[in-house]
């Protein structure tokens, strides 16, 4: 099954630095009015996962969620998270450093989409016990075009 989520080396390095500085992190891609479809990074203690939020994957022990309506839009796209300069006006914690996370997408091939459909829908809502289990299977590095280590594709039980 193809991963739904990939972090570039730059995004992974920034995530690790932010996690060292701020503690456990969570990502959320909401598609809301203020930030559009920019991935937002928060301290886990500062963000409440909604019951319909979809867990796309774990990267370096950080869960990455997308809002339910956004997932409907991105369901057949692989998302690559990267970093660019220009923090701007953002609630995401990396903005203070003058950078921001961005997302790029590509459509899954018909074969990849079929594999995702066969695996069932991703998990939804806050998942503290399942997230711990997911972390045990995750490794530490990821980049586009590589073997996608570091991101655990999520699926239902």
Question: What does each of the following model-derived ranges do?
Answer:
Residues 1-157:
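Domain-level signature for proteins that mediate thiol-based redox and metal-cofactor handling
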């Amino acid at each position: 099954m193809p991963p739904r989520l990939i972090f570039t080396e730059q995004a992974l390095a920034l995530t690790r630095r932010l996690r060292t500085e701020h503690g456990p992190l969570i990502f959320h891609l909401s598609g809301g009015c203020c930030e559009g479809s920019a991935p937002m990074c928060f301290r886990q203690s500062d963000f409440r996962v909604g019951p319909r939020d979809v867990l796309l994957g774990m990267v370096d022990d950080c869960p990455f969620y997308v809002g339910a309506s956004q997932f409907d839009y991105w369901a057949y796209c692989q998302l690559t998270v990267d970093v660019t300069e220009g923090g701007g006006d953002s609630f995401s914690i990396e903005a203070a450093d003058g950078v921001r996370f961005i997302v790029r997408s590509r459509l899954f091939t018909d074969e990849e989409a079929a594999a995702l459909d066969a695996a069932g829908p991703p998990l939804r809502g806050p998942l503290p016990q399942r997230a711990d289990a997911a972390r045990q299977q995750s490794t530490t590095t990821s980049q586009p075009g590589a073997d996608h280590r570091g991101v655990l594709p999520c699926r239902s039980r």
